[in-house]
Amino acid sequence: MATSLSADSPQQLSSLSTQQTILLLLVSVLAIVHLGQWLLRQWRRKPWSSPPGPFPWPLIGNAASVGRASHLYFARLARRYGDVFQIRLGSCPVVVLNGESAIHQALVQQGGVFADRPPFASFRVVSGGRSLAFGHYSERWKERRRAAYGTMRAFSTRHPRSRGLLEGHALGEARELVAVLVRRCAGGACLDPTQPIIVAVANVMSAVCFGCRYNHDDAEFLELLSHNEEFGRTVGAGSLVDVMPWLQLFPNPVRTIFREFEQINRNFSNFVLDKFLRHRESLVPGAAPRDMMDAFILSAEKKATGDPGDSPSGLDLEDVPATITDIFGASQDTLSTALLWLLILFTRYPDVQARVQAELDQVVGRDRLPCMSDQPNLPYVMAFLYESMRFTSFLPVTLPHATTANTFVLGYYIPKNTVVFVNQWSVNHDPAKWSNPEDFDPARFLDKDGFINKALASSVMIFSVGKRRCIGEELSKTLLFLFISILAHQCNFKANQNEPSNMSFSYGLSIKPKSFKIHVSLRESMKLLDSAVEKLQAEEACQ
């Protein structure tokens, strides 16, 4: 028997075909969507996956959006794009690192890859291109850094004698600073402490580096120190002269600022060079070094007259002035900025000031001055210092870095010779790490037994990390402790009631408070300071 299809079989086949087509289309669309998502995830992990970032405008890139407070702009972008993102300043692509994880992965785990500096015009100006801080990363640079670090520690914190000399310098300048502040606040007056503090800190570094100090009214010294702000503004992250070199081609404010920057550097270099030449002339062969300049000169001369078969290491004579310029310039600016912030915080948080003074009185007493050996027994004083550095983050963004090889950070590809900005502020104000990071609370650094939480204290990022970590970090922390301990032990600091509570700041390499006034008064008298300095002078005369 023959078998035949029913009359409606073609329609049934047509309906089935349509359903299959629709189903196939749906499956295809879903497959394409999933494939696209998978490819996107894979693409982000591929070497050609650059960090995301905002749209850059022609010619200027994102420069107009950065603003004065670049660290806050970077933090806002990090919330949108993640801890690793890219902006463009002029024609220069810049990768910005935020957060402890990204920064640690780059600067610590890949220290050598992120240790270079960009070939910026302003960097070439500093110390005639011989600067350690601004110089290119190389084997020679590493030798110079080791020599500079070793000599610096030898004249500051390594040996008991050098620590004693450093404490003596700090004591003498603290005594002079207190005298100036109290005298200018006579009769209930208020003063801006900026200039006296800059001179006091610079005098300590001058004694360490050059073996001399200056009066608080020395016009030449004051002029030399008055340009810290302009210097920081030119070399800080986002400086237009470095990312838009075409601005040098015609008259404009940026070119004017850069030419002033060149003159500031010439003046500073000439100041140090004069010290260098005088030291070479007066240096007695075989004598112990009088200061850091002597030590560098002796080290360089030893290298120059060494066995030709030995591998060269240390500093050349022509490197000495630039190295001293780095140490003196960076230390006095960083320390004076930090000390100004400490005094501001004392006046803004009088309960904190009172607690610092109470701990000093309990541990040190009122019949002597604080010294470095007291530091382990003053946890709240140290907590105040750590919280001040975290809260202010007065060095919010490091000097620009550059990569020496192709690399990855958090899965993003960063090619060789990329300019990299490191946002230290983002680490110090990360709400995932710090409870209520916008609150000033020194007690956060104390454990349940009242001791310093060392793990938390080491998380504060102010002197950078990795190969470019500041060689003066230990010296800076030592001097900050000595200055603020002596000042708090001897003085009371009060805010000017006629000034508004909100403050304005200048932004550059560091965040500096603009002009402000405070009232400074003695807790007792100058007798203890005077007798301590007299005793120190008598001991020096006997040596």
Swiss-Prot record:
Q: What induces it?
A: By polycyclic aromatic hydrocarbons (PAH), beta-naphthoflavone and 2,3,7,8-tetrachlorodibenzo-p-dioxin (TCDD). Up-regulated by diesel exhaust particles (DEP). Decreased by estradiol (at protein level).
A GO BP term here is: male gonad development
The pathway is:
Steroid hormone biosynthesis; Cofactor metabolism; retinol metabolism; Lipid metabolism; arachidonate metabolism
Which residues are heme-binding? Answer: 470
**UniProt keyword list:** Endoplasmic reticulum, Fatty acid metabolism, Heme, Iron, Lipid metabolism, Lyase, Membrane, Metal-binding, Microsome, Mitochondrion, Monooxygenase, Oxidoreductase, Steroid metabolism
How is it regulated at the activity level? Answer: Enzyme activity is increased by cytochrome b5. Enzyme activity is increased by liposomes containing anionic phospholipids, phosphatidic acid and cardiolipin. Inhibited by naringenin with an IC(50) of 5 uM.
> Quick one: where is this thing mainly located?
endoplasmic reticulum
According to the UniProt entry, its GO molecular function terms are: estrogen 16-alpha-hydroxylase activity; estrogen 2-hydroxylase activity; heme binding; hydroperoxy icosatetraenoate dehydratase activity; iron ion binding; monooxygenase activity; oxidoreductase activity; oxidoreductase activity, acting on paired donors, with incorporation or reduction of molecular oxygen, reduced flavin or flavoprotein as one donor, and incorporation of one atom of oxygen
Q: What is its EC number?
A: 1.14.14.1, 4.2.1.152
Q: Which PROSITE patterns does the entry mention? A: CYTOCHROME_P450
The cross-references to Pfam families, in alphabetical order and at most eight, read: p450
- Which coenzyme or cofactor does it need? heme
> In the UniProt record, does the keyword Methyltransferase occur?
no
Question: Which CDD domains does the annotation name?
Answer: CYP1B1-like
Q: What topology in the membrane does the UniProt record assign?
A: Peripheral membrane protein
Where is the protein localized?
A: Endoplasmic reticulum membrane; Microsome membrane; Mitochondrion
What chemistry does it catalyse, as a reaction equation? an organic molecule + reduced [NADPH--hemoprotein reductase] + O2 = an alcohol + oxidized [NADPH--hemoprotein reductase] + H2O + H(+); 17beta-estradiol + reduced [NADPH--hemoprotein reductase] + O2 = 2-hydroxy-17beta-estradiol + oxidized [NADPH--hemoprotein reductase] + H2O + H(+); 17beta-estradiol + reduced [NADPH--hemoprotein reductase] + O2 = 4-hydroxy-17beta-estradiol + oxidized [NADPH--hemoprotein reductase] + H2O + H(+); estrone + reduced [NADPH--hemoprotein reductase] + O2 = 2-hydroxyestrone + oxidized [NADPH--hemoprotein reductase] + H2O + H(+)
Indicate the annotated site residue(s) for Major determinant of CYP1B1 17beta-estradiol hydroxylation regiospecificity: 395
User: Would the keyword Heme turn up in this protein's UniProt record?
Assistant: yes
The GO cellular component terms are: endoplasmic reticulum membrane; intracellular membrane-bounded organelle; mitochondrion
**InterPro entries (alphabetical):** Cyt_P450, Cyt_P450_CS, Cyt_P450_E_grp-I, Cyt_P450_sf
Cited PANTHER family: CYTOCHROME P450 1B1, STEROID 17-ALPHA-HYDROXYLASE/17,20 LYASE
Describe the task this protein carries out.
Answer: A cytochrome P450 monooxygenase involved in the metabolism of various endogenous substrates, including fatty acids, steroid hormones and vitamins. Mechanistically, uses molecular oxygen inserting one oxygen atom into a substrate, and reducing the second into a water molecule, with two electrons provided by NADPH via cytochrome P450 reductase (NADPH--hemoprotein reductase). Exhibits catalytic activity for the formation of hydroxyestrogens from 17beta-estradiol (E2), namely 2- and 4-hydroxy E2. Metabolizes testosterone and progesterone to B or D ring hydroxylated metabolites.
Q: Which family does it belong to?
A: Belongs to the cytochrome P450 family.
Name this polypeptide is given: Cytochrome P450 1B1
Organism of origin is Rattus norvegicus (Rat)
Q: Which gene encodes it?
A: Cyp1b1
